[in-house]
Design a protein with these regions (language model features):
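Juxtamembrane loop segments immediately following a transmembrane helix
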Residues: 142-179
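A surface-exposed beta-alpha-beta supersecondary segment
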Residues: 20-23, 29-103
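Juxtamembrane membrane-interface segments at transmembrane-helix boundaries in membrane proteins
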Residues: 1-2, 89-104, 164-178
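Hydrophobic alpha-helical transmembrane segments
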Residues: 59-62, 175-189
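Interfacial segments of alpha-helical transmembrane regions
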Residues: 9, 129-141
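Intrinsically disordered terminal tails
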Residues: 1-52, 191-223
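Membrane-embedded alpha-helical transmembrane segments of multi-pass integral membrane proteins
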Residues: 15-26, 111-121, 140-150, 184-194
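Juxtamembrane helix-break-helix junctions at the cytosolic face
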Residues: 120-132
């Protein structure tokens, strides 16, 4: 495949794989790579059975982490489809972000695995492998788009639920993991296109070479 398209395609796949790999680790191991982040400006909300007030909570792939007013950080146990319950200061009102909203976050590591396969295939210059790399890149892009849609749904639901807590002022924002997923989707889309265009260019160059070769043989026969 033409190096003009091959090298950028491999770079796009490598960058997408690294970003998705980091997002797949996420909380509780990489606490900066969450999808939705809630900051509380007043009131004394608490999480689960904890009684110490918190000022922030983050939602990641495998767990959530919260920060108490004294700066102490705690995280839930790491597993898929975790649930979070947040109480108001009097522990009379509460909201829950259930497992149905976090179960789909496991699509991120699936997209990471598919991206890794596409990356390995893209390292070959064989026509069959480059075609497979292009197709699998688009598959990884589709899975990443699904993961991003799940991130959007989680963010919207968290924002909706936090607004239902009486006496608690909160601000819900998208977090780094949210945007890294979007960037990964764009990179995978670019990678699939560059690999596909590179293969198309190789076919055109091969056809041109064959055409000139046939004309040369025809001229030699005439003279």
């Amino acid at each position: 495949m033409s190096r003009v398209f091959h090298i950028p395609g491999v770079i796009f796949l490598l960058c997408a794989f690294v970003l998705l790999f980091l997002v797949s680790i996420s909380l509780p191991y990489l606490t900066a790579l969450d999808f939705a982040r809630v900051k509380f400006s007043n009131g004394s909300p608490t999480v689960g059975s904890e009684t110490n007030p918190i000022h922030q909570i983050r939602f990641g792939t495998w767990a959530n982490c919260w920060y108490e007013n004294d700066g102490t950080r705690s995280c839930s146990s790491a597993h898929n489809a975790y649930s979070t319950t947040i109480y108001d200061g009097q522990r009379q009102d509460f909201v829950t972000v259930g497992p149905s909203w976090t179960r789909g976050l496991a699509v991120h590591p699936v997209a990471t695995g598919v991206t890794f396969i596409a990356l390995l295939l893209s390292l070959s210059t064989h026509v069959t492998f480059t075609l497979l790399a292009s197709l699998i890149s688009f598959l990884a892009a589709l899975l990443t788009l699904i993961a991003f849609a799940i991130d959007i749904a989680l963010y919207a639901w968290v924002k909706h639920q936090m607004g239902k807590l009486d006496g608690i002022a909160s601000n819900t924002d998208t977090a780094p993991g949210f945007w890294l997923t979007l960037v990964s989707f764009l990179l995978l889309s670019f990678a699939g296109c560059t690999v596909c265009f590179g293969r198309r260019r190789d076919r055109m160059e091969g056809a041109t070479t064959y055409n000139y070769s046939w004309k040369d043989r025809f001229r030699r026969r005439r003279y």
